[in-house]
A protein has these predicted regions:
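Catalytic, metal-anchored helix/loop core of enzyme active sites in primary metabolism
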Residues: 1-383
Length: 383
């Protein structure tokens, strides 16, 4: 039986991971759960799954969490340092990195050092410090299995293949709720509109990133590190139906793709059961009901965030870290009504210009870069 730690268990990926566990109680046991501050749901999960340990990142919730679980033999931890230590516990086999944003970097690094298998949903970890993560995974011989639907599709399409035969990766994007909006219309869209994704059910932050196509930019960077492939061999295709989750084109001209209904439990389960496939109750894809599959080139004028992601990756160094930090600032500001939709790209671009560039950053450099870029982005928002 695999012992699982879920970082970010109260978020969209975390709750769907627990759905997978419910389907296969004979195979998976929840050893550890963590949340940022969603204490009520964390308590509910702890009561259902009876983990050995729970951790709340926001230390102000430590006492009420302890009180709520006082009758159970569950160890309660709090704080970012405790979270990074929790993932190294010997009993844990798999760490599901489902935390949102930069906060997922340190615990993922510690889990790799402890030689845990990583089921990676936190794409920001590879965006911020892909080179370090790649180096550590190779050093400690740790498997990093993708949970993102697109990267899982590529991963599945590569089974039995040699990377030398890969011509390019085809990364699909739904285009989000504003795919058919004009540039003028996009100036006035609201957070409420952006949060209505046409195909996928996700958390608030990633849904906004999807609407701005920054999420797809992050996925390009993530794919570069996961599959050790140059960025110029990663092509983004807008595919509104979200049926083809992504594909691989080979040197002989053939293309392998993974298709399915838009349900994150599929890639989550595959990451947990790889290399095997197990039964699942997700809805089956009805190809007779699928009227058409269409593909378009992304419009970089209306979605400049995708171009900024390519620019950051091509420049390298700490620039993807700058991209991520600035995006986290403007994403929250947009959700809170302090930033316009198209203004987000402007702030990110200017932050990339103003933040000190470091060619070969260390972990400490990434920490400082994150702080500097956030400060610059916040100052730009005030103007």
């Amino acid at each position: 039986m695999k012992q699982i730690a879920i970082l970010g268990s109260t978020g969209s990926i975390g709750t769907q991971t627990l759905d997978v566990v419910r389907q296969h109680p004979e195979a998976f046991s929840v050893y550890a759960l963590s949340a940022h501050r969603s204490i009520d749901l964390l308590i509910k999960q702890a009561l259902e799954f009876n983990p050995a340990v729970v951790c709340i990142a926001d230390e102000t919730y430590y006492r009420p969490l302890c009180e709520a679980l006082s009758d159970l033999p569950i160890r309660v931890l709090a704080g970012k340092k405790a979270l990074a230590e929790m993932v190294t516990m010997p009993a844990i086999d798999v760490v599901v990195a489902a935390m949102v944003g930069y906060a997922g970097l340190r615990p993922t690094i510690e889990a790799i050092k402890a030689k845990k298998t990583i089921a990676l949903a936190n794409k920001e970890t590879l965006v911020v410090a892909g080179e370090i993560i790649d180096r550590l995974a190779k050093r400690y011989k740790v498997d990093i299995l993708p949970v993102d639907s697109e990267h899982s599709a590529i991963f599945q399409s590569l089974v039995g293949e040699d990377m030398i035969s890969v011509e390019k990766l085809l990364l699909t994007a739904s285009g989000g709720p504003f795919r058919n909006f004009t540039l003028e219309q996009m100036q006035y869209v609201t957070a409420a509109e952006a949060l209505r994704h046409p195909n996928w059910e996700m958390g608030a932050k990633i849904t906004i990133d999807s609407a701005s196509m920054m999420n797809k930019g992050f996925e390009v960077i993530e794919a570069r590190w996961l599959f050790d492939i140059p960025v110029d061999k990663i092509q983004v295709l807008v595919h509104p139906q979200s049926v083809v989750h992504s594909a691989v084109q080979f040197v002989d001209g053939s293309v392998k793709a993974q298709l399915g209904t838009p349900d994150m439990r599929m890639p989550i389960q595959y990451a947990l059961t790889y290399p095997e496939r197990w039964m699942s109750d997700v809805a089956r894809l009805d190809l007779f009901a699928t009227q058409s599959l269409t593909f378009e080139e992304p419009d970089l004028k209306r979605f400049p965030n995708l171009a900024l992601a390519y620019e950051a990756m091509n420049k390298g160094g700490n620039m993807p870290c700058v991209l991520n930090a600035a995006n986290e600032v403007v994403n929250l500001a947009f959700r809170e009504g302090r930033c316009g939709f198209m203004q987000m790209s402007d702030v990110i671009a200017k932050t990339m210009e103003k933040t000190m560039f470091i060619t070969e950053p260390t972990y400490e450099d990434y920490v400082q870069t994150d702080k500097e870029a956030r400060k610059i982005a916040l100052e730009l928002l005030k103007r």
